[in-house]
C-alpha cells in the first residue's frame, strides 16, 4: 500500500503490513518531515566548526566527545524542529509543487496538530541539549531557528524575492554553533565560515528556483526567476559567487596556502560555469549544473578545512 493512501493511525492498525514494512514506511515519512537532507548538510558545517575549534584551541577531542555528541544531536534536533514547523506552515502551498506534494503534512500521514507539537518539542529538546555545551552555541542555534521559521518561512518567503537572502541567515549558523560549543571567543575562522555559508546559499537556491520556476509560480512564491526572469537571476548568481572569491585569503594566515589555493580554484570553477549562463539558452540545464556544483563545493570545502589542519600540513 502506498504511503499516500493512509495515515499514521491506519498504518499502525493495518495487519496486512509487516512490522518491518511499517518501520520502513514510518522512517521514510519522518525523514521527509524533518527534511533529512537539510539536516545532514548543516551537520557537515557544524562538525567542521567544532573540529576546527578543537584544533585552534589545542583541545582534545577525546576529552570533549560528550560535548561533541551534545552539539551534533542538539543541532540536528533544532534544525529538524525548524523544518517540521516549516512543513506545518507551508501545507497550503506544498501540494502545488511536485517536490513537496508528497510530504506527510500534505498527504495527511500526520495530523497538523501533531506536526506542530512535534516540531516545537523537537526544537526545545535540541536547545536544551545545546545549553549543556555553551550559551553561545544555544543562542546561535536559536537565531538560526528563528531566521528559518519566522524571518524566512512566515515573513519573507511569500512576499519578497529577497527571501533567499533572508533565509541564508539560518543556514550560516551551524559552523558558529559548532565552534561556540568549544570556544565562545571571536575568531576569524568561524566568522569566514559564516560568510561562506551565507553567500553560498543564494546561488545554490536561485539555481534550484530556476529549475523549479514553474512550480514556484504555480505556488505563488515570488522567487527571483518568477518575478524578474531568468536573465536577471543568472546575473545575480554570478555576483554572489564572485563575492566568495576574497574569502579564502582571509584564512591564509590560519588555514595555510593549500586551503587558499584549492578554495580559490573551486570559486573560480563555479564562477566560470556561472558566466557560461550568459551565453546558453537551456536555462534549466545550466541551473542544474550550477546546483550540482554548489553541492560538491560544500562537500569538498568544509572537510578540506579540517584536513589542512592535520599534522601533515603543519
Swiss-Prot record:
Pathway: Porphyrin-containing compound metabolism; heme O biosynthesis; heme O from protoheme: step 1/1. GO terms for biological process: heme O biosynthetic process. Its EC number is 2.5.1.141. It is a multi-pass membrane protein. InterPro entries: Protohaem_IX_farnesylTrfase, UbiA_prenyltransferase, UbiA_prenylTrfase_CS, UbiA_sf. GO terms for molecular function: protoheme IX farnesyltransferase activity. It catalyses: heme b + (2E,6E)-farnesyl diphosphate + H2O = Fe(II)-heme o + diphosphate. Interacts with CtaA. Converts heme B (protoheme IX) to heme O by substitution of the vinyl group on carbon 2 of heme B porphyrin ring with a hydroxyethyl farnesyl side group. Belongs to the UbiA prenyltransferase family. Protoheme IX farnesyltransferase subfamily. This is Protoheme IX farnesyltransferase.
Amino acid at each position: 500500500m502506498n504511503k499516500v493512501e493512509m495515515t499514521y493511525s491506519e498504518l499502525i492498525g493495518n495487519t496486512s503490513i509487516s512490522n518491518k514494512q511499517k518501520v520502513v514506511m514510518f522512517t521514510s515519512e519522518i525523514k521527509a518531515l524533518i527534511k533529512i537532507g537539510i539536516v545532514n548538510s548543516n551537520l557537515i558545517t557544524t562538525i567542521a566548526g567544532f573540529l576546527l575549534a578543537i584544533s585552534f584551541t589545542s583541545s582534545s577531542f577525546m576529552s570533549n566527545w560528550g560535548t561533541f555528541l551534545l552539539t551534533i544531536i542538539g543541532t540536528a534536533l533544532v534544525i529538524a524542529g525548524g523544518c517540521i514547523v516549516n512543513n506545518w506552515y507551508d501545507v497550503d502551498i506544498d501540494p502545488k509543487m511536485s517536490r513537496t506534494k508528497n510530504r506527510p503534512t500534505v498527504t495527511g500521514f500526520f495530523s497538523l496538530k501533531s506536526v506542530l507539537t512535534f516540531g516545537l518539542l523537537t526544537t526545545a529538546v535540541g536547545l536544551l541539549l545545546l545549553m549543556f555545551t555553551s550559551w553561545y552555541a544555544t543562542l546561535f542555534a536559536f537565531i538560526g531557528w528563528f531566521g528559518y521559521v519566522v524571518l524566512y518561512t512566515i515573513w519573507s518567503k511569500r512576499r519578497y524575492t529577497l527571501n533567499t537572502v533572508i533565509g541564508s541567515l539560518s543556514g550560516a549558523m551551524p559552523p558558529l554553533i559548532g565552534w561556540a560549543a568549544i570556544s565562545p571567543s571571536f575568531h576569524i575562522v568561524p566568522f569566514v565560515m559564516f560568510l561562506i555559508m551565507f553567500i553560498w546559499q543564494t546561488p545554490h537556491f536561485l539555481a534550484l528556483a530556476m529549475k523549479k520556476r514553474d512550480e514556484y509560480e504555480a505556488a505563488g512564491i515570488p522567487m527571483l526567476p518568477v518575478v524578474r526572469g531568468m536573465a536577471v537571476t543568472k546575473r545575480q548568481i554570478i555576483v554572489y559567487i564572485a563575492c566568495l572569491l576574497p574569502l579564502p585569503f582571509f584564512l591564509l594566515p590560519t588555514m595555510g596556502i593549500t586551503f587558499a589555493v584549492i578554495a580559490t580554484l573551486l570559486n573560480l570553477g563555479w564562477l566560470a560555469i556561472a558566466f557560461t549562463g550568459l551565453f546558453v539558452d537551456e536555462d534549466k540545464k545550466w541551473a542544474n549544473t550550477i546546483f550540482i556544483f554548489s553541492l560538491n563545493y560544500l562537500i569538498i570545502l568544509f572537510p578540506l578545512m579540517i584536513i589542512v589542519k592535520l599534522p601533515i600540513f603543519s
